[in-house]
Amino acid sequence: MGHKIHPTGIRLGITQEHRSKWYAPSKTYPLLLQEDDRIRTFIKKKYLAAGISDVLIARKADQLEVELKTARPGVIVGRQGSGIEELRSGIQKTIGDRNRQVRINVVEVEKVDADAYLLAEYIAQQLEKRVAFRRTIRMAVQRAQRAGVLGLKIQVGGRLNGAEIARSEWTREGRVPLHTLRAEIDYATKVASTTYGVLGIKVWVFKGEVLPKEEQPLPVGSSPRRSRGNRRPQQFEDRSNEGK
């Protein structure tokens, strides 16, 4: 069953959290759900070069909180935070409410090569440049292994290398326990547009197991203490709306 169901959906409330956190009555629920989709689509299209891994949305009364997980936060923040104001006005225009309070937090992805979506995006970019798919997969696996992931599975499907008949090929390195609910599986999909058609990309990344009474997974053999040599991931929190 673990191979049939969506890896994220089956782990909601165990190791995964919802990407949208808010409550609404049945009449306004569809409108807010479409609003979240428009916001994510707008951000992904506007910041293609920022390496955005995920967009989390939360609502509190009339305030909208948007958290961006990105590999290059400087592209979004800009000089002296000018990019934040531009992004806020763009979100307000997208949802059609200029008076809505929008709070934006930009969080840097600590390990880019251990993120499933960023790995899938890297594979898609290489395939669109006509790089051989086996070479691309091998390079992605090497990058993930250097990042310290415990397991990785990559699947690519379509007209591989321009073949007449579409097929799917996959590779796996390490452990990817899809049946274990306490396993933190980072899953992402991406579509690569090539001259021969579109290729579907799926990436599973196993980062560790969440044991009872633990909030974050600890990889095998690692220590919970952070070494002094490791750099803290950058986080930019928007406080411009406070006090209004």
UniProtKB/Swiss-Prot annotation:
What does the UniProt keyword field contain? Ribonucleoprotein, Ribosomal protein, RNA-binding, rRNA-binding
* KH type-2 domain: residues covered: 39-110
Pfam families linked: KH_2 (PF07650), Ribosomal_S3_C (PF00189)
> Which SMART domains does the record associate with it?
KH (SM00322)
Regions of compositional bias (Basic and acidic residues) in chain numbering: 234-244
User: Segment Disordered: which positions?
Assistant: 214-244
Q: Name one GO molecular function term.
A: mRNA binding
Q: Name one GO cellular component term.
A: cytosolic small ribosomal subunit
BP term (GO), one:
translation
Transmembrane helix as a keyword of this entry, yes or no, is no
Q: Family membership, please give it.
A: Belongs to the universal ribosomal protein uS3 family.
Q: Which NCBIfam families match?
A: rpsC_bact
Supply the HAMAP family for this chain. Answer: Ribosomal_uS3_B (MF_01309_B)
Q: What does this protein do?
A: Binds the lower part of the 30S subunit head. Binds mRNA in the 70S ribosome, positioning it for translation.
Q: How does it assemble?
A: Part of the 30S ribosomal subunit. Forms a tight complex with proteins S10 and S14.
| Name listed for the protein in its UniProt record | Small ribosomal subunit protein uS3
Query: Which source organism does the UniProt entry give?
Result: Prochlorococcus marinus (strain NATL2A)
